[in-house]
Amino acid sequence: MTFLEEILAQKEVEVAKMPLEQVAEKRKTYSFYEFLKANTNTMQLIAEVKRASPSKGEINMGVNPVLQAKSYQAAGAGMISVLTDPVFFKGSIEDLREVAKNVGIPVLCKDFIISEKQLIRARNAGATVVLLIISALTEEKLITLFEQALALDLEVLVEVHDQEELAVAQKIGAQLIGVNNRNLHTFEVDIAVSERLASDFSSDACFISESGFRTAEDVARVSQKYDAVLVGEALMREATPEVAAKSLKVTR
């Protein structure tokens, strides 16, 4: 079994036990898509709260998610990403709920979403953006969840890893497209994935490069074609995350 297959098998079990929540009032913040369109002079940062990962194991188990998120916000991050997967990433929906209560910027629910139950739960916890990973879904399921998320007034970050997936994301009209430099089957990371796919951008979407960024030089590699980068592990390992986040700022 690959990492992705193992995660999805566990996710089916998790979602089967998950209650279907009533839709509650949505948390108020700005549209991340509109924010990116209005702030094109600088590469924007999606800063992530991540305790652990399948490939790296424990990264920062003792983190206070609220203090970490506040540090990111103070550093000028445009959005906070919160891992909510409990088994492989040691996150929780409570992490997201607490972060969303304590920051004013958009919060992304970072999880392997396979059900509308997860979309409603994320919205109720304060997320205004959700992640849909093309390699984790059939195209039919992707479209269903994409439409359900939009109906819930959520923004959707559609994640791709190759040209075929990018074509699907552009075809369905995704406004936020994330290119994951990490292969979810092997968990190997290569920023060259984002460099390669940039030549196939053909929509008015905002493009985000995800994974593998440690320095401003890394960010500069994708700064001409991408609007933002998503950074997790590099920030989670730093004693001063605000300083680390500021160090990744790159002018376009």
From Swiss-Prot:
It comes from Listeria monocytogenes serovar 1/2a (strain ATCC BAA-679 / EGD-e). CDD domains: IGPS. Keywords: Amino-acid biosynthesis, Aromatic amino acid biosynthesis, Decarboxylase, Lyase, Tryptophan biosynthesis. One of its GO terms (molecular function) is phosphoribosylanthranilate isomerase activity. HAMAP family: IGPS_B. Belongs to the TrpC family. It catalyses: 1-(2-carboxyphenylamino)-1-deoxy-D-ribulose 5-phosphate + H(+) = (1S,2R)-1-C-(indol-3-yl)glycerol 3-phosphate + CO2 + H2O. This is Indole-3-glycerol phosphate synthase. GO terms for biological process: L-tryptophan biosynthetic process. The keyword Oxidoreductase does not apply. NCBIfam families: PRK00278.1-3 (NF001371), PRK00278.2-4 (NF001377). It is an enzyme of class 4 (lyase). PROSITE patterns: IGPS. It comes from the Bacteria. Pathway: Amino-acid biosynthesis; L-tryptophan biosynthesis; L-tryptophan from chorismate: step 4/5. The keyword Protease does not apply. Pfam families: IGPS. Its EC number is 4.1.1.48.
